[in-house]
Amino acid sequence: MANHRIDRVGMEIKREVNDILQKKVRDPRVQGVTITEVQMQGDLSLAKVYYTIMSDLASDNQKAQTGLEKATGTIKRELGKQLTMYKIPDLVFEKDNSIAYGNKIDQLLRELDNKS
């Protein structure tokens, strides 16, 4: 039962953070950032927010990380307005490499298919 609540809160935070990034945060460093997953700690005090960015350049990834860290206060304040929770969890942003990994595997499979 508690695990279900943790999952629901994570999904709601994911939806709201995506919305906040699109509508409220004007920092150009976070343009093109998409939230892919939110993992909540058991006591709902910490949320790991995984994101992807369209660019593969390391400099763009670093800029996006810096922009997200700078916007954390704004995002948390807006979450406080949208969510009915006693305490809004602390947000930690991490780059999600699963999309790039999946694309690499897909490319390898296509290469194998072309060879046969």
Curated annotation (Swiss-Prot):
Q: What are the recorded Gene Ontology BP terms?
A: maturation of SSU-rRNA
Query: Listed GO cellular component terms?
Result: cytosol
InterPro entries in the record = KH_dom-like_a/b, RbfA, RbfA_dom_sf, Ribosome-bd_factorA_CS
Instruction: Decide whether keyword Cytoplasm is in the record.
Output: yes
The Swiss-Prot or TrEMBL record annotates one GO molecular function as: ribosomal small subunit binding
Question: Where is the protein found, in the record's own terms?
Answer: Cytoplasm
SUPFAM superfamilies on file: Ribosome-binding factor A, RbfA (SSF89919)
Q: Where mainly located? A: cytoplasm
User: What keywords tag this UniProt record?
Assistant: Cytoplasm, Ribosome biogenesis
Q: Which Gene3D superfamilies match?
A: 3.30.300.20
Please give the subunit comment from the record: Monomer. Binds 30S ribosomal subunits, but not 50S ribosomal subunits or 70S ribosomes.
Function, in words:
One of several proteins that assist in the late maturation steps of the functional core of the 30S ribosomal subunit. Associates with free 30S ribosomal subunits (but not with 30S subunits that are part of 70S ribosomes or polysomes). Required for efficient processing of 16S rRNA. May interact with the 5'-terminal helix region of 16S rRNA.
Q: Which family does it belong to?
A: Belongs to the RbfA family.
Read off the HAMAP family from this record.
RbfA (MF_00003)
Q: What is this protein called?
A: Ribosome-binding factor A
Species lineage: Bacteria, Bacillati, Bacillota, Bacilli, Lactobacillales
